[in-house]
Amino acid sequence: MIAVLSFSGKPAESQHVLASQQTHYQSMVNEQKPTPIKVTDNVRKTLLENGLTVLTKEVHTAPVVTVQVWYRVGSRNEEPGVNGIAHQLEHMMFKGTKNRPIQFGRLFSALGSDSNAFTSYDQTAYYGTAERNKLKSLLVLEADRMQNAVIDTEQLASEKRVVISELQGYENSPEYRLNRAVMGAAFPNHAYGLPVGGTKADVEKFTVEQVQQYYREFYTPDNAILVIVGDFQTESTLETVKEIFGKLPKSQESRVGETRLIASVQQSTVNSPIVLREPGAGKLLQVVYPLPDVNHPDVPALEVMDYILTEGRNSRLYQALVESGLANDITAYVSSLRESGWYELSVTAAPRQNLAKIDSVLNKTIANLVKTGVTAEEVNRAKNQVEASAILSNRDLTNLAIQLGNDETTTGDYRYTERYLAGVREVKPADVIAVVNKYLKPELRIVGWFEPSQKQTKALTTKIQYAQTTEKFSPGSPVAPQEVIKYLPPVDEVTYLSTRELPQQFTLANGLRLLLLPDKSTPTVTLSGYINAGMEFDPEDKAGLASLVADNLMNGTKTQNFLAIAKALEERGVGLDFEAYREGVRIEGESLAGDLPVLVKTLADVVRNSTFPATELELDRQQALTNLKLDLDDPDEVAIRTFAQSIYPKNHPLHTYPTEKSLQRIKRQDVIAFKTKYYRPDTTVLALVGDFDPTKVRSLIEAEFGGWKVSGEPPKLKYPPVPMPEKIVRVNSVLPGKVQAITYMGYTGINRQDPRFYAASVLNQILGGDTLSSRLGAEVRDRQGLTYGIYSYFKVGKNAGTFWIEMQTSPEDTSKAIASTHEQLKQIHQYGVSASELEAAKQNLISNYNVSLANPEELAKRILMNQVYGLNEVELRSFSNKIHQVTLSEVNQAARELLHPDKIVVVTAGPAVLADHTIQ
């Protein structure tokens, strides 16, 4: 996995602007500043004799622990010709060791650990979060692969195919291709200008000797940081760490002590825009300004500058570009790394807009900021957002450990984020103007334009019915759990009882349901909500209506315009977002504990009193049309749309998707009528988890939502039954300019209330629940190297959902991967699973469930959806026991009843795939 880690209040991915609110809400907030929270309180740093740095922090809010190993090596340590070798090695670290010649993903899965890894510019990191009794086992596995990884010819050849599949997946994205060109021009003499994952040309040439040498040079205790956060005792854990890791010697070939010759970041000589004219759907603009390294004193002011320019609807560039209708969206982030940094702005143009004009407005807006200055109000709002973001991001143990590891790896100081936040608090308006003048000079920037080279055309879709096979594919043997157990480190006995506290439940007189679960572990509140107003209610000729309603809720109410709504939330760093799903509209909210009234009052106002101003509604429609255009150029979006429409007939709720015509047909009166009909208190559920007094929150909800009145019965919708196809159906949607194919295989499934749900969950875990340890993962990804990722799902809801398998493959591997997957389905349908597979899958599901509930966001969603699905209130506690009680006969019966290998729909989107008859 590739990740871009940087010191920024915002991640380096696209930012959805969280709409927000103003003045008369100020009275709800205590203006007295709280004492700054130090996430590094109680962190202990230990240096072992072999040079290993150990960071430990006890957090006893849940019986869960996260173990992470960070290596101070990333793409920064590469050069042309070996670009991507750090990422390739990351993949190889899962292929087994001298002591454990087995895919490590299977070992982590057997522990029920949420484990993964990523490579970035300055580091490579491996992490696992599991129940606390698995702590020692995780330590043993990480120590083993620190020095005993097996890197051989056969394994490398297989994993190089996987990496190339991953890279080709990125190549499908015009944004990725444009960013690669812009970064290469911005850093022509530095490794930061190389793509983190490498290139296909370089990866294909990697030799076993090169990868082994890289491993010996950089994977050594004195180049590593071990981070442990969670429910453990520090003293005894450090003794265990010394026992396991302390005996590892430094590598004799280590390059850790070498003085690295750092290439200076020279001013680019590229003065005109880099223009890519390639197949695609939308025009894109990217701008990169070089910045100083992470330890430079200007970094806090640069972060505040970024928030003023791009964060929220009141920000300067959002107003100038998005609200004006020039752009569909704008995202930005400050990246601060060991040797330099950069500020990246990315803009998606609105239809029929000119990139030169957008670029001109962007430049003028930045120049005008210098000319007019920034206000103290803007600076304070940005500082509050940065601080709230830092606190909210650390609600989860894994994220907290990642912050510590990233800080220590990149800056040499695990306390860096606190120094950075202290710097942010000191930023003045003059500091913001100073960094704009210093770094955002027009002559310093690198600009890239993506201009689609052709008019968008519909995907060329071919449909083939298969009646016989002309190629037989022999799958490997199923994963043997006894082999996993053979190499699994001993697990400490469980010494705690899983008696999870249940939420308090209340129902208002108007039918609104409220679930409250206090949690004082962090001074934050997480809100998850649901309104039964999803896309299933879209008229076929006005598909997209439910989403347009949800997207416009915060565009104005009877008393507040959209800027006022945005301002109230942004000033406190409060997040509130609505998204229409097939079943229901989901509400996601988060705030610091003291700002909960702002969140609740804003939510009530927009849900009850939204007015859908015509100007903002039309702007959102244009954005929806642009997003549709981009979706129809995305193989994953095209594949899932074609897949659903190949299974479900017209007039079925799961068949309907927005089109340009359906979006154009929607009138303002349609939006108002839909909102009036489907947004009702008696179909609304709110779940809150966090630092609050339940009595006070209940009173607040009563006050804000109690007056919400509607008449009549709530609308109900029951999906009609859909027959299975009579034979295998194969569809290939060809998209110009794509190099990686996306495939979906499946058919109709079950609903959440189906008595087979728990057996189906266990069956799915064995079949494709994990891309490294499942049958599909072990065969298609690990043994054959045909895909970067393959998963299966039973997507359930109040109504029957869909069973599907998804994978991404190179076009030359697609047919073989489909054939292999089909054979695995036939095998498990006909012969079932083994008792040892059953027990391993149940343990994995139970452990993953317990780990997920340590994350407040996951906990709030689980509480919410249990209520939405009409499950018993004790489901939060009893889920694990129900999984534990699933029998072998129940799983094998589910395999016979729910897997239909000879009645499957197979859809592939992306490059043309040879339609050879590989499945029957």
Predicted segments with their positions:
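Short, conserved secondary-structure transition motifs
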Residues: I164-Y170, V265-R277, A382-S393, S591-L592, ...
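Histidine-acidic residue clusters that define the catalytic metal-binding segment
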Residues: M28-R44, L141, E166, A185-A224, ...
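Non-catalytic, conformational "gating/processing" segments within enzyme and secreted inhibitor domains
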Residues: K160, Q212-E243, L444-R445, I672-E704, ...
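Extracellular/periplasmic catalytic domains that process cell-envelope and extracellular macromolecules
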Residues: V39, L47-E49, H60-P63, T119, ...
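M16 family metallopeptidases and their MPP-like homologs
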Residues: A62-S75, G84-Q88, I102-R145, R177-A201, ...
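Bacterial N-terminal signal peptides
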Residues: M1-S6
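Proteolytic maturation boundary segments
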Residues: F7-L55, Q233-R277, Q319, E418-I531, ...
